[in-house]
Amino acid sequence: MADGTHSTHRNPSTAQLIELALSRGEGELTANGALVAKTGERTGRSPNDRFIVKEPGSEADIDWGTVNKPFEQTVFTALWNRVESYLGDKELFVSDLEVGADPEHYQPVRVTTETAWHQLFARNLFIVPEQFNAADKPIWQIMNAPGFECIPERDGTHSDATVIINFAERKVLLAGLKYAGEMKKSMFSVQNFLLPAKGVLPMHCSANVGIKGDTTLFFGLSGTGKTTLSADPKRFLIGDDEHGWAPGGVFNIEGGCYAKCIDLSQKNEPVIWNAIRFGTVLENVTMDENRVPDYTDSTLTENSRAAYPLEHIELRKEENLGAEPHAVVFLTCDVSGVLPPVSILTKEQAAYHFLSGYTAKVGSTEMGSSSAIQSTFSTCFGAPFFPRPAGVYAELLMKRIESFGSQVYLVNTGWTGGPHGIGKRFDIPTTRAIVDAIVNDDLKGVETEHLAKLNLNVPLAIPGVETKLLNPVNTWEDKAKYAEYAQQLAESFTENFAKYQVPDSIKNAGPNA
């Protein structure tokens, strides 16, 4: 990249980047030492602005549609050159990082940013290796220019901003976007395309490990509890959002955490609270007059975030790796108040619910989404990030579960006693007690009750959980109303699942509409 008049900061330290971000007016320092940055009107991902370059090497393997939208190679080249030229006379920040904490499955990536704070984010969220690219793999390039304004008529984009992935050239272009989450999710999408070809399942999940070396995975959309539940003071964290499951073990795709901050409290989330300090980027968080962050304030967005390196977490797996999981938890946030707090799934039910990805958008991470909580089906609990057809990932999950014998659970972190607005949301201590029972193997072989309409098996008792909560009908005053809502939910599952071509054993593992 041309750089005639200004310096380029290569592999800058955390302190250097914070110093530069402050001197350049990119952010402010909080009382707890974190750097606060604002992202303007885009406070979440922009799915309508995300594209994949259509080229012969990957075209046949991508599930083209509203999520994976095609972009012309020649138009991409022109835009990349235009952005490169725009950055040519600017002070730049460049780091050599890696994505994937596995010596075989990592991808080397050179990240170039226009701002110091985006570079700090990249160094917090990606892996800063002791030796860059030890296996001498071809290097990916990320070019991040938030100050560049796209012109759709000229650049072929949807708006004034864009995210474009080019598999053939190993390039990711981010232009006109300040929201830093786009950077991490673009490389997640890259790994989600590359890993299945090697027999590795990429997952939108968090992971932690117990003292005995037992790994647990938590799948779920943003706001359903992935980060909160994996940040367990009694267990060692592997990572909070993106992992690969290979034969023999699980590895983190990242080197940091990107935790939601809305209503963050020291009491309920001590691990995250303590991780927010010097070196952390707080995105769209407001402060009081004493520079103390106000995590209750959603003026800027419900999607306020903290980006910090894994080193900020005391109890963690330093090598970012774990054994294959003995327990897999699908986190669903049920706004209808129909699903039980926990169900024990068969292998076929696991495939059904993995493909369905039923949950809710909570404090949505996407631009243009209403702030209201709404139910959604998100394939693999992360539809926006998976370039291949859903069946590829479901098949890999089934293989991994079968070969290792992992037990899968469906845990509802949403509502009970009625839908959102009438019922109440399961509190964090209740969900934690359920997760404790799962990781301690207390639910293996327990007596269960079958909920026919939902086709789910629920335990009759769990230590530390009020028994009344376990069968959701018991928490509804109006039982007929519950039956009505359960029927509606079963129908929506069936309707959504009709698009999948899968064996009957999986098709019949869902609710009975």
Curated annotation (Swiss-Prot):
Q: Which reaction does it catalyse?
A: oxaloacetate + ATP = phosphoenolpyruvate + ADP + CO2
- The residues listed in the UniProt record as binding substrate, with positions renumbered to this chain, are R45, Y179, K185, R305
Question: What residues form the membrane-spanning segments?
Answer: none
Q: Where does Mn(2+) bind?
A: K185, H204, D241
Coiled-coil annotated spans = none
Question: Is the ATP-binding keyword given for this protein?
Answer: yes
Where does this protein reside within or beyond the cell? Answer: Cytoplasm
Q: Which GO terms describe its cellular component?
A: cytosol
Q: Name the GO terms of the biological process aspect.
A: gluconeogenesis
The cross-references to InterPro entries, in alphabetical order and at most eight, read: PEP_carboxykinase_ATP, PEP_carboxykinase_C, PEP_carboxykinase_N, PEPCK_ATP_CS
Where, by residue number, does ATP bind? K185, H204, G220, L221, S222, G223, T224, G225, K226, T227, T228, E269, R305, T431
Question: Per the entry, which co-factors are needed?
Answer: Mn(2+)
User: Superkingdom, according to UniProt?
Assistant: Bacteria
- Comment on bound cofactor: Binds 1 Mn(2+) ion per subunit.
State which pathway it belongs to.
Carbohydrate biosynthesis; gluconeogenesis
Key words, A-Z? ATP-binding, Cytoplasm, Decarboxylase, Gluconeogenesis, Lyase, Manganese, Metal-binding, Nucleotide-binding
- Pfam families from the xrefs? PEPCK_ATP
Gene Ontology terms, MF aspect:
ATP binding; metal ion binding; phosphoenolpyruvate carboxykinase (ATP) activity
Oligomer and partners: Monomer.
Function description? Involved in the gluconeogenesis. Catalyzes the conversion of oxaloacetate (OAA) to phosphoenolpyruvate (PEP) through direct phosphoryl transfer between the nucleoside triphosphate and OAA.
Q: Which family does it belong to?
A: Belongs to the phosphoenolpyruvate carboxykinase (ATP) family.
Which protein are we looking at? Phosphoenolpyruvate carboxykinase (ATP)
- What organism is this sequence from? Shewanella sediminis (strain HAW-EB3)
Q: Recite the lineage of the species.
A: Bacteria, Pseudomonadati, Pseudomonadota, Gammaproteobacteria, Alteromonadales
Q: Which gene encodes it?
A: pckA
